[in-house]
Amino acid sequence: MALKKLLAATALTLAAPFAYAQSALESGLGELEHIGKPEQAGLSFQAGVTELASDIRWLDNMLLVIITVISVFVMILLAICIVRYNARANKTPATFTHNTPIEIAWTVVPILILVFIGAFSLPVLFKQQEIPEGDVTIKVTGYQWYWGYEYVDHEVGFESYMIGAPATGGDYRLNDDVRAQLADAGYTEDEFLLATDTAVVVPVNKTIVMQVTGADVIHSWTIPAFGVKQDAVPGRLAELWFEAEEEGVYFGQCSELCGFAHAYMPITVKVVSEEAYEAWLAAAVDEYGGNPESLPAFETAMN
């Protein structure tokens, strides 16, 4: 227990100056609407702000219609069989063993349905996997249990911890000190477990390429509002891309079980105007230039 307290205090001492400096940089971004986050009693996707997210929502709605029609059809058939062919209504059961036309139909029709679905789903999949040339390239490294980011074209690197994690002086619980940190960073109390002490900052309407890897175990970098999710596998470098169409703050979380603090590994992305991004980047280069702390200590291979 004493060792854990010592490690937590050491992490706080090392991380605090960086966290406050990063907050000062982000304070120049102005007020941003908090768009991409879970909603109480929400039953659908988060509001999508990328073409990828819109495509996924459209595909999901189309599949819902198809599945609903199939389910209703099957339930009607079951109801007919129950009513017309129960023991009381049909005292003399049929003796035939097969019906060739029906068997052909229930084989061919599902094949046609799957081909129809594939004709629309495969283009969505390919669009996600075909990585365009990025206006901004950011390397993401998953650690137990925080994220490291490196703007590879500018040698700017920083680490991102959940507000309330031991590295920020917390113990993964919401208390008065954590409430104060959330308020100082511009977050609300219900954004605890989502907000981080440092955020990824990207320009609006620009192609962002994220190069994702892991330093210890498998993690997964996910932003629902962007329609992106990529596993962070140690020893491999995978890519995803997005182009956010609306300024705001967007939240995500690690989506691959990675240990006891998996639930405390959120992601915060701030989408800002190009002018605000350039100003933030210039300040970040001055503050962190030449210090890409998120570089893992091993070679990675493209997959």
Residue map of PLM features:
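N-terminal secretory/membrane targeting signals
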Residues: 1-24
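Residue-level signal for alpha-helical transmembrane segments in multi-pass membrane proteins
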Residues: 14-17, 77-80, 113-116, 120
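Non-transmembrane, membrane-proximal soluble domains of secreted or membrane proteins
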Residues: 23-62, 85-303
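Hydrophobic alpha-helical transmembrane segments
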Residues: 65-79
